UniProtKB/Swiss-Prot annotation:
GO cellular component, one term: cytoplasm
Record-linked NCBIfam families: peptide-methionine (R)-S-oxide reductase MsrB (TIGR00357)
A single GO molecular function term of this UniProt record: peptide-methionine (R)-S-oxide reductase activity
Boundaries of every MsrB domain copy: 3-126
GO BP field: protein repair; response to oxidative stress
EC number: 1.8.4.12
Catalysed transformations (reactions): L-methionyl-[protein] + [thioredoxin]-disulfide + H2O = L-methionyl-(R)-S-oxide-[protein] + [thioredoxin]-dithiol
Record's keyword terms, sorted: Oxidoreductase
Protein name as it appears in the record: Peptide methionine sulfoxide reductase MsrB
InterPro entries reported in the protein's UniProt record: Met_Sox_Rdtase_MsrB, Met_Sox_Rdtase_MsrB_dom, Mss4-like_sf
């Protein structure tokens, strides 16, 4: 999708985050404290990125996950902005900036913390997965209930 089209589809914050690598404010974003079951998809491509089953409260003020739902849907780049060396996470298909990954996540879940901007995500509640075309991911939640 062209940048002109994206600026019409996205809110100004979503555009700044996904296209210009901005960071939204901590504790003042849509999903940092979302506790509902479902999946988080790329706001642009709709590709599945994360699941609520892997979301945890890291205390940082942004949605944090221990792993992606489909590893092939994201890519990692070294980021040297703000005089730091970090690993930036981008959506593979839309090349949107999502956030960063750090090695301070829960050790029993692999030790990673994917710190993601809410503005780069769309949440699909568990109840709407089938209707929204993500029915194949219902099995993740059904396993939990067994």
């Amino acid at each position: 999708m062209k940048k002109d089209d994206l600026s019409k589809k996205l809110t100004p914050l979503q555009y700044e985050v996904t296209q210009n690598n901005a960071t939204e404010p901590p504790f003042n974003n849509e999903y940092w404290d979302n506790k509902s079951e479902g999946i988080y998809v790329d706001i642009i491509s709709g590709k599945p990125l994360f699941t609520s089953l892997d979301k945890f409260d890291s205390g940082c003020g942004w949605p944090s996950f221990t792993k992606p739902i489909v590893k092939e849907n994201i890519k990692a780049n070294t980021d040297f902005s703000y005089n730091m060396k970090r690993i930036e996470i981008r959506s593979k298909d839309s090349d949107s900036h999502l956030g960063h990954v750090f090695d301070d996540g829960p050790k029993d879940k692999g030790g990673l913390r994917y710190c993601i901007n809410s503005a780069s995500l769309k949440f699909i509640p568990k109840e709407a997965l089938e209707e929204e075309g993500y029915g194949e991911y219902l099995k993740l939640f059904n396993k939990k209930e067994e």
